[in-house]
Amino acid sequence: MNREKVQVGDSVAPAGAGVIVVAPQDGMDDKRLAAGELPVFNCVGGRDALPAESRETSPRHEPVPAGAPPTVHRTTSFSVLDILDPNKFTSKRQTPNRTGCEFAFGAENRSDDSNHTIEHKSYQEDYDCKKTSGILKDGFVFRSDECESDFTRGNQSDSELQEDLCSEESSALTGNNDAEFGQHEDDDSISKSPDGQQTQQSSSNGQNHQVKPKRKRSGSDSKSGKPRRARTAFTYEQLVALENKFKSTRYLSVCERLNLALSLSLTETQVKIWFQNRRTKWKKQNPGADTSAPTSGGGGGNGPSNGLGGLSPLSPSPPMSGHLSMHTSYPGHTPGGLVCTTQLPFLPGHAVLSPFMLGSQTYGAPTFYAPHL
């Protein structure tokens, strides 16, 4: 009897009101609970067995709110009409339920997951199955709305979007890996290739192209830790005086350097640099002869070089330097900067003594340089 009453209540709304009248006359709470539980059982079976029939009955159930009396709704909460009343869940909770049920339905269509099945059963226990089917029907009918259309479109094309994202990420990762692999190949080829090939590859690679000029600059300035200075232009008289002084001694003391700089109107730094360059040139001409060189002079050999030795047109000939190298083991310099007279007999006969070697200050006239030309 109760099942027939429920079926009548599902089909016709006034018959449902008749069921409410019969239920209080029985005076049994168990029958009311059974009548309330029967729609859930019938709907679950009806939805699993005949989903089309449940969808067809949902539009019939929507006009019920217009004819449902509100007074009967407040009489008892266990009546059939109270459970089947759509106004019970319409005002505030229908929209999230609609989206939630639609999400559950889309999940079931996409994959038969146990979690989605449990969520769908919880919706059936909380709400009426007829109402749930009506909500699903409304979801299909009113899918033209912006929010619901976007949500359902996201649920239906979720797998496609994931595949697209995976493909894009895989392509991006492969591109990055290719670029990194290309950079590693360039680095390996640069490290294994000679200097000529490295120059060609550095023109195509920006970073290597920036590293290459640094290497060139460090190679050019390896002798000096600062930018190159302007080359000093020595006059003819200054060059002759410096050459004659270098013939007498290859290392200058502090006093000799100061006197020579003042006499030639040069700075001590210029005199020191010229002697350093001249010693370097002499060592190249006479390898192995610098071991017996005197070190009594104050000039060091670690200063910056700017290639001033190439300007000297009066470099001594190898025989002259050879004769002077025989007497380099005799340190004959005095603190006053004069050459000792004991060193004069050891000089060769063809080496004419000039006022420069005697420490004289009267060497400005060009007549003194005639014998040396």
UniProtKB/Swiss-Prot annotation:
Record Gene3D superfamilies: Homeodomain-like
Residue segments, region Disordered: 49-74, 149-231, 281-328
Biased composition annotated in UniProt, kind: Basic and acidic residues: 53-63
Name this protein carries in UniProt: NK1 transcription factor-related protein 1
GO-annotated cellular components: nucleus
GO MF: DNA-binding transcription factor activity, RNA polymerase II-specific; RNA polymerase II cis-regulatory region sequence-specific DNA binding
Cross-referenced SUPFAM superfamilies: Homeodomain-like
Main location: nucleus
Positions with biased composition (Polar residues): 168-177
Keyword Ribonucleoprotein in record: no
Keyword entries, A-Z: DNA-binding, Homeobox, Nucleus
DNA-binding span(s): 227-286
BP term (GO), one: cell differentiation
Known role: May participate in the energy homeostasis regulation.
Biased composition annotated in UniProt, kind: Low complexity: 196-210
Keyword DNA-binding: yes
Entry-linked PANTHER family: HOMEOBOX PROTEIN NKX (PTHR24340), NK1 TRANSCRIPTION FACTOR-RELATED PROTEIN 1 (PTHR24340:SF26)
Family from the record: Belongs to the NK-1 homeobox family.
Entry-linked InterPro entries: HD, HD_metazoa, Homeobox_CS, Homeobox_NK-like, Homeodomain-like_sf
Localisation: Nucleus
A matching Pfam family: Homeodomain
Organism: Danio rerio (Zebrafish)
CDD domains documented for this protein: homeodomain (cd00086)
Biased composition (Gly residues): 296-310
